[in-house]
């Protein structure tokens, strides 16, 4: 059985989503759209499960916000306390970069990152600012929220070269979750390391994976092994680090 809970704070979106779920729910499973906020829904759900001592089934959270507020790092930490949970976050880097220094956005950005360190990117511009923001968010998912594996997927703006439109960030606590997500995203591509958005012709494909040099990867692996204290390193350990 697969349970789907769709969450939106806009009643019109809830009605549209519920109609879509109903049209696809062939096996009459529990698929429903709720009119609430992500924060309220998550805290209510985990509060209920903790109170009754229920065993938590595997959970996959796709967080697709309008903007950059409403999904605090502290809330993601609560989700990732459970071993069989995954996060897939649409990080709207354009909006974040645009309002990085705005006073009205300061509190929301601090909640988003779980730190004030986002301000360190204030003096940067363009790709450098975006790279700093994404890097900080990924590190915070690991160090503040408790994800063991984090993978970013860059989606570029159609017709604007490598200018990122947003980043999809996957966080989990198990290597298998990372493998399945990375392999699944790659299978959606018609070319190596590319993603074709629905409704766009092949000439307007969106980049899925950031370019990766094999030579650079070899150098990174060599540096990792040279700095290792053990004489023998299990292959699984190297795979988990490099994947």
Language-model features, listed with the residues they occupy:
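Class I S-adenosyl-L-methionine-dependent methyltransferase catalytic core
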Residues: 1-243
């Amino acid at each position: 059985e697969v349970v789907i809970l769709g969450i939106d704070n806009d009643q019109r979106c809830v009605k549209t989503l519920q109609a879509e779920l109903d049209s696809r729910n062939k096996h009459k499973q529990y698929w429903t759209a709720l009119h609430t906020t992500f924060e309220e829904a998550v805290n209510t759900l985990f509060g209920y499960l903790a109170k009754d001592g229920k065993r938590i089934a595997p959970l996959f959270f796709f967080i697709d916000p309008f903007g950059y507020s409403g999904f605090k790092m502290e809330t993601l930490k609560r989700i990732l306390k459970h071993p069989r949970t995954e996060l897939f976050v649409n990080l709207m880097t354009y909006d974040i970069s645009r309002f990085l220094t705005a006073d009205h956005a300061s509190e929301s950005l601090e909640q988003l990152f779980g730190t004030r360190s986002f301000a360190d990117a204030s003096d940067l511009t363009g790709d450098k600012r975006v790279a700093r923001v994404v890097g900080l968010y990924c590190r915070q998912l690991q160090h503040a929220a408790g994800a063991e594996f984090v993978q970013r997927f860059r989606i570029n703006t159609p017709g604007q070269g490598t200018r990122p439109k947003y980043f999809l960030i996957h966080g989990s606590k198990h290597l298998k979750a990372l493998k399945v997500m990375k392999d699944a995203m790659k299978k959606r591509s018609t070319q190596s390391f590319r993603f074709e958005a629905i409704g766009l012709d092949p000439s307007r494909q969106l980049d899925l994976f950031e370019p990766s040099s094999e030579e650079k990867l070899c150098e990174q692996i060599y540096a990792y092994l040279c700095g290792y204290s053990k004489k023998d390193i299990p292959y699984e350990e190297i795979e988990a680090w490099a994947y």
